[in-house]
Amino acid sequence: MSAADLAARVQARVGTVPLDAHEFRGEVTLTAPAERIVDVLAAARAVLGEPTVLTDLTAADRYPSEPRFDVVYLLTGYSPPARLRIKARLAGEAPVIASVTGLWPGADWLEREVYDLFGIRFDGHPNLVRILMPADWEGHPLRKDFSLTEEPVEFVEHVPKVPSTIIPKSPPRE
């Protein structure tokens, strides 16, 4: 299936939902409205056939541009082989998008990672809590406006640093 054909078939399934299709090196990227992302992903899954795998779900911070965030879904279909990237743009300091754990249960940890590192909330997620950073961490470290100071960070389970000792070099054996 050609890239243009793939984009046209997804567009036909979602009807009046505006999709912006872009092809680069034979791979299609569809930009969809964030409020319809679940419908667009379900249509893409139907077009790609079974099995369709959510290979990756990530985000990009485009600060200072608006809309500020891109949430990016990478789908892989195997019959016939095809890859499709679908993006949704989100604005504001507290962006929210619908969870796709209903379509792909494996999106659970991917959505938690994006939430933890970018602060993007996934509405309807069954357990949206931090997955990489400590529970008491303030902020989201992959945001471009995240403070990069040299301040010491205090963790809940702080273990005092053990002083290092320099072991003297032993004299050469004779």
Protein language model regions, located:
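Terminal low-complexity/charged segments
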Residues: 1-174
